[in-house]
Amino acid sequence: MSNPVFLALDIPRLEAGKALVDKVKAHIGGVKLGMEFFYAHGHHGVHEIAHCGLPVFLDLKLHDIPNTVAAAMQSIHVLEPAIVTVHASGGRAMMEDAKAAAGENTKVVGVTMLTSLDERDLERTGVDGSPHDHVMRLAELAENAGLDGIVCSGQEVGAVHKQWKQGFFVVPGLRPAGSASGDQKRVVTPRQARDDGASVLVIGRPISKADDPEQAARDIEATL
């Protein structure tokens, strides 16, 4: 895609979200709608954002038994999302069924490790090894399950890209140089992630919380 930036629209009010997208749409490539937005506004909200004319990424992080996840994927066919997320830790069968149930033009990507987590967090959940090792294991599982790609931090995307040449890689938790990292622990700049093989760059607060969101989006676009 010509512009890999997807705006993370984590705004509870629909009209405010639409207004923000209208302001910045010339400088982004799509809009990511997460659980907060989807649970608040449902199918109607997705349709309203889609009217802005940009691809919609539904970041629903589906994680359940295979049959339930497949049914959930079928229920969002009508929304025609460009991308949908499932948790790679849900296992191969779940990912296979999710991909089989997805629309023909929808990319299904597996969430590997949230960018708010680090090695200590992994240890507390009983996962051995480094974040890098954990992401690489789940990336291999997602590839073998037939997914289009994965979600990973910018710190891992370079290594995953070398392992999975044809993969589609979504990188969240990005911060322009000089920005505060907030609750993100494994961050890089949008330019670095793109250079390392990211297909989609998910950027939220550096644009949505900026004094001038349009200028912030324009500045990020100029670095790519």
Curated annotation (Swiss-Prot):
What chemistry does it catalyse, as a reaction equation? orotidine 5'-phosphate + H(+) = UMP + CO2
Q: Where is the active site?
A: K61
Task: Please give the GO cellular component terms listed in this UniProt entry.
Answer: cytosol
Give, as one word, the top-level EC class: lyase
Q: What Gene Ontology molecular-function terms does this entry list? A: orotidine-5'-phosphate decarboxylase activity
Q: What is its EC number?
A: 4.1.1.23
Record's Pfam families? OMPdecase (PF00215)
Binding positions for substrate?
A: 10, 32, 59-68, 115, 175, 184, 204-205
Superkingdom field: Bacteria
InterPro entries named in the record: Aldolase_TIM (IPR013785), OMPdecase (IPR014732), OMPdecase_AS (IPR018089), OMPdecase_bac (IPR047596), OMPdeCOase_dom (IPR001754), RibuloseP-bd_barrel (IPR011060)
Q: What does the entry give for GO biological process?
A: 'de novo' pyrimidine nucleobase biosynthetic process; 'de novo' UMP biosynthetic process
Pathway, per UniProt? Pyrimidine metabolism; UMP biosynthesis via de novo pathway; UMP from orotate: step 2/2
Provide the alphabetized UniProt keywords: Decarboxylase, Lyase, Pyrimidine biosynthesis
- The UniProt record lists the keyword Nucleotide-binding: no
Biological role stated in the UniProt entry: Catalyzes the decarboxylation of orotidine 5'-monophosphate (OMP) to uridine 5'-monophosphate (UMP).
Q: Which family does it belong to?
A: Belongs to the OMP decarboxylase family. Type 1 subfamily.
| Subunit structure, as described in the record | Homodimer.
What is the protein name for this chain? Orotidine 5'-phosphate decarboxylase
Origin species: Erythrobacter litoralis (strain HTCC2594)
